[in-house]
């Protein structure tokens, strides 16, 4: 089964009016958490991503909460590598729970969907500060126009969905109320 078929069967692509984690607006939202409602789909996608990044030979797989936690874990499982995650504390991405990055360790950063790459860039900063060596970045879905990182970037599929600044959003102009599904909007 292809990644596109899995996304469709899992109901991961939502339609409506959404405010993305970046603050931009969109008519569609990819909710990759829906993939993991069915463990078979989650395992399939993690295996696909593991095959994509195996050539980088990472020592550690790290994903930002919330979206990157599941896919980073399943990818690490297939590569038999250590897995940790970052999370927000008072609005700032941090490494907690006793997680460590060993200086010199080759690190793969895994995310579910990348649009602007903002969360991943915050993880990059943490990894670099702790002396990790980033070998690659990977995601299930690429919504970016180009690679927004200075590191190799692998993904399973590219989905082009128009995004709008708030003042240019046609859905706002129609007074359609937006939803905020991204983890950046979870109550702190």
From Swiss-Prot:
Gene Ontology molecular function terms on file: magnesium ion binding; orotate phosphoribosyltransferase activity
The entry's keywords: Glycosyltransferase, Magnesium, Pyrimidine biosynthesis, Transferase
Enzyme Commission number(s) from the entry: 2.4.2.10
Gene3D superfamilies, per the entry: 3.40.50.2020
GO-annotated biological processes: 'de novo' UMP biosynthetic process; pyrimidine nucleobase biosynthetic process
Broadest EC class assigned to this enzyme: transferase
Protein name: Orotate phosphoribosyltransferase
Gene from which this protein is expressed: pyrE
């Amino acid at each position: 089964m292809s990644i596109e078929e899995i996304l469709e069967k899992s109901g991961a692509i939502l339609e409506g009016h959404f405010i993305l984690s970046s603050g931009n607006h969109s008519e569609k939202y990819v909710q990759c958490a829906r993939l993991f409602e069915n463990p078979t789909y989650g395992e399939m996608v993690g295996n696909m991503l593991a095959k994509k990044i195996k050539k980088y030979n990472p020592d550690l797989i790290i994903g930002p909460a919330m979206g990157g936690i599941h896919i980073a874990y399943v990818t690490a499982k297939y590569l038999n590598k250590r897995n940790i995650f970052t999370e927000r504390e008072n609005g700032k991405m941090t490494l907690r729970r006793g997680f460590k990055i060993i200086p010199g360790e080759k690190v793969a950063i895994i995310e579910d969907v990348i649009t602007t790459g903002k969360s991943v860039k915050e993880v990059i900063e943490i990894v670099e500060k702790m002396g990790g060596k980033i070998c690659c970045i990977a995601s299930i879905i690429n919504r970016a126009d180009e690679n927004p990182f200075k590191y190799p970037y692998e993904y399973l599929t590219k989905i082009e969905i128009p995004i709008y600044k708030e003042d240019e959003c046609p859905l706002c102009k129609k007074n359609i109320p937006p939803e905020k599904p991204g983890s950046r909007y979870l109550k702190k």
